[in-house]
Regions:
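Acidic catalytic loop of the alpha/beta-hydrolase fold
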Residues: 209-213, 273-275
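Glycine-rich nucleophile elbow surrounding the catalytic serine of serine-hydrolase chemistry
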Residues: 132-142, 212
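Short beta-strand/loop motif that positions the catalytic acidic residue
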Residues: 197-199, 203-206, 210
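Active-site nucleophile loop of the alpha/beta-hydrolase fold
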Residues: 91, 156, 160-170, 187-191, ...
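Alpha/beta-hydrolase fold nucleophile elbow
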Residues: 122-134
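Membrane-embedded segments
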Residues: 20, 28-116
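An N-terminal hydrophobic leader/cap segment in hydrolases
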Residues: 1-30, 320, 327-336
């Protein structure tokens, strides 16, 4: 699933990157460095291969029943339909990735991928779209909330949740019953709460015949959207104050105005959890949503961003030198 595809004057180059990540080392142990594969689809100028000219970047957090290989065709479709770059990080324990998959390690990989996009690839935070599918909707919503509340970056351009759950605990309660879920399942990825703390437009996509994660989960999330209007105004004031306090205005700015509080639900008519039209019921609704709700730069007449001048031939070496970053930046380091 790696290689190149040329469409007129654009080349979509798919490569595999070894993403350095810090994960918890266990009880009283220091964090451990691992490497997780990350599928990267870069949109390049056919005449100037070193120049990447996408409108932005999508970080795609895939579902439970697949890996980055299984998500590769969807990633390429998003790159073509949205005129953007796409990163698909692998979860520890999935595919060829080492380690164990749990909330802390998946959140750590998500953090490392966002850091890779923003700091190494130089993607502005307001050109970064977080897209989660099924189980990936939890870490995607959690990352958007962290970027809004505590990250020096600011909120992403948009958050897209495809077949989301309100929380892992509520999902387990439906499947196993209240007592059993209380005894065996802790509260993880509380998307319902995280959406009230997210300062960007949110698109929910759900099949009305989803037999794995029932449609009512998205309906509940959409119903709670009214709570975001007040929260969005508070976050907007907080972001402005942080810009003034920092004094440099770098990254921290709110470009979405009232759209920051938008939560829109797209219903996939007749679609189940795994059977749906990816073009018509995922890629196209995302493209329309980004244009409608002032998500830079999709609403600016399709102008490409400034070229990154990134030589992809040396990407592996640059990533290795870049490293996993400081432990204090990771979500697990800030758990109370």
């Amino acid at each position: 699933f790696v290689g190149e595809l040329q469409v007129r004057d654009v080349i979509y180059k798919t490569v595999m990157v070894r993403l350095p990540v810090l994960v918890p080392g266990g009880l009283c142990a220091p964090p451990k460095r691992i490497e997780c594969p990350c599928l990267a689809v870069f949109r390049a100028d056919a005449k100037h291969l070193k120049r990447c000219k996408g409108k932005g970047c999508v970080i795609y957090l895939h579902g439970n029943g697949t890996d980055i290989g299984g998500a590769s065709e969807e990633a390429k479709t998003l790159a073509r339909e949205l005129d953007c770059h796409v990163l698909v990080p692998e979860y520890p324990g999935y595919g060829l990735a080492e380690g164990e998959s749990n909330e802390d390690t998946v959140d750590a990989v998500t953090h490392a991928c966002i850091r890779f996009a923003v700091e190494l690839l130089r993607v502005p935070h307001d050109r970064l779209v977080l897209y989660g599918r099924s189980v990936g909707t939890g870490p995607a919503a959690a990352a958007a909330a962290r970027m809004t509340l505590s990250s020096p970056l600011g909120p992403p351009a948009a958050l897209v949740l495809h077949s989301p759950y309100t929380s892992i605990y509520e999902y387990a309660k439906e499947k196993a019953g209240g007592l059993l879920s209380y005894l065996l399942v802790s509260e993880r990825w509380p998307t319902r709460k995280n959406l009230t703390q997210t300062g960007c437009p949110v698109l929910l996509i759900h099949g009305d015949r989803d037999e794995v994660i029932p449609f009512r989960h998205s309906a509940k999330l959409r119903k709670d959207a009214a709570k975001r209007s007040t929260s969005a105004n508070t976050r907007k004031d907080n972001v402005k104050s942080k810009v003034n306090k920092a004094g440099d205005g770098k990254f921290r700015h709110d470009t979405r105005g009232a759209s920051a509080g938008v939560v829109q639900l797209h219903v996939q008519k007749g679609a189940s959890h795994n059977v749906f039209d990816f073009y018509g019921d995922v890629a196209d609704p995302i493209a329309s949503f980004l244009k409608r709700h002032e998500c830079a730069p999709w609403h600016k007449g399709g102008e490409p961003w400034e070229a990154m001048d990134l030589d992809l031939r040396h990407l592996d070496a640059r990533v290795a030198e870049f490293g996993p970053g400081d432990m204090e930046e990771y979500p697990f380091a800030n758990m109370s």
